[in-house]
Structure formats: structure tokens, C-alpha cells
Amino acid sequence: MAKRVQVVLTKNVNKLGKSGDLVEVAPGYARNYLLPQGIANIATPGILRQVEQRREKERQRLLAERQEAEARKTALQTIGRFVIRKQVGEGEAIFGTVTTQEVADVIKENTSQEIDRRGITLPEISKTGFYKAQVKLHPEVTAEIEIQVAPL
């Protein structure tokens, strides 16, 4: 059986791993391709320590981002209802539709939180009334808010 060499990747490599991963490869692959191209470093105890420190920092950063998103979710749900005023025609039908940008602007106006409009999911809104919207604040955190569409 051939001997394998442990290397730490410095760049993402298809079918091998992503930057910072510890992988075992054939010695020739490491010596002839990965090391000369600067794609990997031989896994020494010092480099393994550095990789572990980077992973810990990244884990802490992701945890802080998630906690901040949870706090933003709580703030949005505390307010409860956001009012959007639209011009109304006959039978409570509004002119145009309520867009995600309008919802993001109302949220910013009421909470001073910048929300990306692409993270907002709205139902089809064509009349005045109350609607539920989903606001994705983080890949794992989604807040549900209530939108009231009212006449001008």
C-alpha cells in the first residue's frame, strides 16, 4: 500500500477539499503539483496549530453573526406590524403591488436596521389588509413579520 502525505490546503481544490482542510494525498501529487503551485503546505505541527486557530476564529465569527441575527429577529418581532400605505382603487384593490424593496424601506424606517430585499419573501399582495412576510436574516434565522397594507 502506498504511503500518503498529509497536507493543508491553502486554496479550494475540486474533489479534494476547501481552503484550510487537512487532507491525505499521494506523495507525488503533493510534491509535483500541490506544493509547487502553492495550493497546499505540508502538515507540520505549527501549521496544524495555525489551521486550528483559524477554524476557531471562524467558528466564533459565525456564532457572533448568528447571535446578532437572533437579536435582529427579536427586534423585528417585538414591533409586530409594519404599515405600508398604498393608493387604493375600487374594492380595496391597490394600484401596483407591494414590493420587497418597499418592505425593506419600511423596516429600515421603523427599526433603523438595514435589511436586504432579496431576503424578504412576500405573498401576492393586491388588496389592503394584513399579510405575513418572511425575512431571512441569516441562513439559519428567519423572522416572520406582519405587514398591513393601508390606504393613503
Curated annotation (Swiss-Prot):
Key words, A-Z: Ribonucleoprotein, Ribosomal protein, RNA-binding, rRNA-binding
Gene Ontology cellular component terms for the protein in this record: ribonucleoprotein complex; ribosome
UniProt-listed GO biological process terms: translation
NAD listed as a keyword: no
Keyword Ribonucleoprotein: yes
Superkingdom to which the source organism belongs: Bacteria
PROSITE patterns: RIBOSOMAL_L9
GO MF terms held by the record: rRNA binding; structural constituent of ribosome
Cited function: Binds to the 23S rRNA.
Family: Belongs to the bacterial ribosomal protein bL9 family.
HAMAP family: Ribosomal_bL9
Protein's UniProt name: Large ribosomal subunit protein bL9
Species: Gloeothece citriformis (strain PCC 7424) (Cyanothece sp. (strain PCC 7424))
